[in-house]
Structures are given as structure tokens and as C-alpha cells.
């Protein structure tokens, strides 16, 4: 595996599938805007999660892939005494922006209270600037970055990792512009610096999106681990005899206002899985570590409990190292403990019942668990949430085992077996984690009835996108699934959609190459 970000050059050879036509269009659009040709294009793709929903903040590994939609940043380096950045977006909804770069080499200011598209570029600029100061302090500590004209173009749908792809492309563009065309940046370094980029606009993500955008490979899924450190390993899908593997990504067009719904949705789920971990720790008399650098895990999480349980009761002092067989064995044990501990309270725990389960007072429980994030609830569904996290983590390992060691006698065997895991994931997201919605369930049902083998939500849920495992090639079902979704979902629920909006709502993709540079 190439450890550095790939660089392609003119004349065009071996460009990523999704980039073959787009690079010509973005070069032309750049020329129409700035009346010169760009020096290079920084590209970063969108992503979808194949299996592994709402388990990353419990530090369990996930299985995403990069897709054939991307953010392109075409760049012309400027030799200016007072350097500035001019940003133009292909989408006219986003106005052109221009900002001066600090002459003393200080960081560009970012105001997270302002919802502004250029802030995401500034996030990438900021982490790239920090990286440059570390690798070449004598050059970048007290002098400004170079100025540039930049044209941004994207076809990544909402929920497909647009902001993360933008920050990755922006960081790569900044490093290339300042270090020259012969400088190589490792995928590891680009992932590491961009994993925290969006924190500067108040988005506390964990690095999965950036790792997927950077490490993506054609025809591969990525096994993204969060312990002992962020790591992405590509795994190739099996070679089939008569079909190709494609994914249909269909947007429900349901937008969940995260600020308004977080107290009953995302924030509440984080609280519930944290309380579940501590209730299990109390019941089995083990201590959970505190992660002070992560408010989500400050009081420990469900993976911490698994490691602590095995340290005490199975004499396994070392935490789980990611081994598939060991992980499957331990997760099955965790599911057994969840049944033993919570199954009598499937209706949920009141604050009084939860505090009793943690051997603390109601006041202590409120202080420790209900003040970090605003939440609203009648009961905490510890059984359902813990069962989802452990069973979903188990499905990730089963999927990985299937990709690395299973033998399939027919193409249909693969689609059936892998699709079953995706369908089980959707059922768990819907019934146990309750992060699906009516529209998501409708799309999944229509797709499954018309040629998809596995259909599920992808991303946070409560709307957003769905992903469907569909055979492609001469005998494939892609067009059949796409046509059914248009006729039975979009035309019924959204009859006023334009052809362009419909085109954007359904994407057909194979696993795509990650972040790269194209030199003109």
C-alpha cells in the first residue's frame, strides 16, 4: 500500500474513476473565473459507512469506504507581497470570499459562531499551517503562507462527508502550495492533522471521516480503528465471477436539525451508552478509565468495560488488540452480560433507577451524566443501546472476517451473506438505537424488493443517506433499484423534485480512491 498521498500528473494516466472527466471541467471553470490555468488540483472524496453505526464514540472499529463523489480544489499559486486567498465556489449559493494572510506568520482567525462555507477551508488551512510550522519552523514561524486563487467544486451529498472532504482538500492544497510539487505528505500525517480540523468550527468528530477520505482505495473497504490510535487499513472486496460490487447511495432528503434534536437523539444516545457502561462496571465491580481529552468518554465507555471485565475475570491484562477472532469471542460475551444485566428493564431506567444501578445519589447522577450535554428523556434505554453497540461491533468483525477468509461458491453467496449483515445493522439501528426514520425504512424496503441485497442507513441517521449493496455489470440490478426508488419513493414523496435534484439524490458508486493531487 502506498503510504503517501498519490500524485497524478499531466498527461493523464491512471486517474481515479470519478476524476477522469471532472478534472477537465474544474480546470475550465477555474480559467473562466480567474483567466489563468491552475497549477494543481487537490481532491478528496466523500464517504459512507458500510457497517458500524454509532459505535465509534465507544471506540469500536467501523467499516466505511470512500465513494465516487468528491471535493476538488483547483489552485493557482500567487507571488504577492501581501498574500491573500481568493475562494470561489462552483455553487452560486456560496459567495466568493477573499481574505489576507497574516504577514507575521500567525494563524488565520476562524469565528465558529458564524455559519460560513469558507470556514471549512480555513480549518484545513489552519492545521496545514501548524504542520508546516513543525516541519520547517525557520521558514513558516514568522513569515506568511503563499497566496492563491482557488476554485472549489463538489458533488458530495449532504451526509456524505462534505465538510471533512473539504478540510482534507484544503489542508493538502495548502501544504502543496507552500512546499512545492516535489513534496510528499504521508497519508498518516494528513489524517492526523485533519482529524481535528473541524474542531475549530465547533464540530467534535473523531477522525473516521478524514481517515476514510484520505486512505480510500478503489474496490476496498476500510477497517478504521480508534485504539490504541487512529488507523485505517484497506481490505479488498472479493473478486466475483459474473458481477461487480456497487453501492447505491440514496438520500432520504430528510434533514435533522442537529441543534434542535440533539437533546432527544444524538446527545441522549451518548449519555445512554455511557450510563450503560458504568452500570455494567458497577454490577461487575470493575473500574473504567477516564478519557479527559474526550468529553464523550470522560466517564468511560462500553469498550472500556469489555477490556476491564476481561482483565478482572479472564486474566487478560492487555486490552483487546483488534484481533478478529478474539473480538468476536469477547463481544458475544458482552451481549450475554447485557442480557443478564438489563433485560428485565427493557422498558428503560428512570433517573432514580439509573442512579441506584450506579450506586450513587440522584444528585450525583445528574451532576455526572446530565450536565455535559442538554438532554430530554423519560427513561434511559440502557438495554437497547448497549445491545446495539456490542452487536453492531460484532457485525463489523463478521464483515471483515467474510472479506478476508470466507470462500464464496457463487456471486450470490457473497451478496446474500454480506447483505444479511447490512440488513441486521439496519434493524438494530431502527429498533434498538432508534436512529432510523419512516423515509429511511421506506427506501430500504423498496430497494430490497427490487434487487438490493443489503440496505441500511449510513451516517448519524434520523434522515440523511441510505446505502444499498447491489450487483452491477451486465447482469446487475443497479438500474432496477434506481428506477424503483424514483417511481415508488421520490416521485411519491417529493413530486416537485427537478431532474438535477433527483440526480443528486441517488448516487451509484464503487469504493473509490482517497485523497490525491493532480499536477497540471
Swiss-Prot record:
A GO cellular component entry from the record: cytoplasm
Keyword ATP-binding: yes
Top-level taxonomic group: Eukaryota
Biological processes, Gene Ontology terms: galactose metabolic process; maintenance of protein location; positive regulation of transcription by RNA polymerase II; positive regulation of transcription from RNA polymerase II promoter by galactose
Keyword ATP-binding found: yes
Misc: Present with 721 molecules/cell in log phase SD medium.
NCBIfam families in the record: gal_kin (TIGR00131)
Protein name as catalogued: Protein GAL3
